[in-house]
Regions:
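Binding-site signature for planar aromatic cofactors or substrates
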Residues: 1-169
Length: 169
């Protein structure tokens, strides 16, 4: 049984707005600066809930789990988000100590993936604040044809400096 056909989904309208080209020649050395620039452009263009992010973890059996949260802040320590103290997410973060995050600002055709070490930043009775310290960023800019993209990957080297790789599809 097909619940949502490929034809049906393929005919849905795709709304997107070109803000600007992804100028690969002027990328900052620090991916946090590029993230901040993209975030501020999403806010300026009225993107709903630009702070919404999918946070992915794994359970004790290695099965992935993902859910939506809102980031509270981004600073030199990483991305901060709040969660109820007694959730599967907290248990998984405590056990594994790592998380992945994915921001998707669809109307701008931009996505940012982040992977890093997760640690508890604030331990409350009912609320915890967690921090994901990025070790890997991937910025994706989809072209108008939606078949091609520019991607830039930042990874931390052994000296805590960011290396950049540009990929084009």
């Amino acid at each position: 049984m097909v619940y949502l056909s490929q034809d049906y989904i393929g005919e849905l309208p795709k709304t997107h707005t070109s803000v600007s080209d992804f100028d690969l020649s002027s990328l900052p050395r620090d991916p946090n600066e590029l993230f901040t620039q993209w975030f501020e452009e999403a806010v300026a263009h009225g993107i709903g809930d630009p702070s919404a992010v999918t946070v992915a973890t794994v359970d004790e059996h290695g099965r992935p789990d993902a859910r939506m949260v809102d980031i509270i802040s981004l600073d030199e320590k990483g991305f901060h988000f709040g969660t109820s103290a007694k959730t599967a997410k907290v248990s998984q973060l405590e056990q594994v100590g790592a998380a992945a995050m994915c921001f998707w600002w669809q109307p701008l055709r931009r996505a940012v993936r982040v992977r890093g070490t997760a640690s508890r930043h604030f331990d409350g009775e009912r609320l915890n604040v967690w921090c994901v310290k990025p070790e890997h960023f991937e910025f994706t800019f989809l072209w108008d044809d939606r078949l091609h993209s520019d991607r830039v990957i930042y990874t931390l080297d052994e000296f805590d400096h960011w290396d950049r790789i540009r990929l084009q599809r």
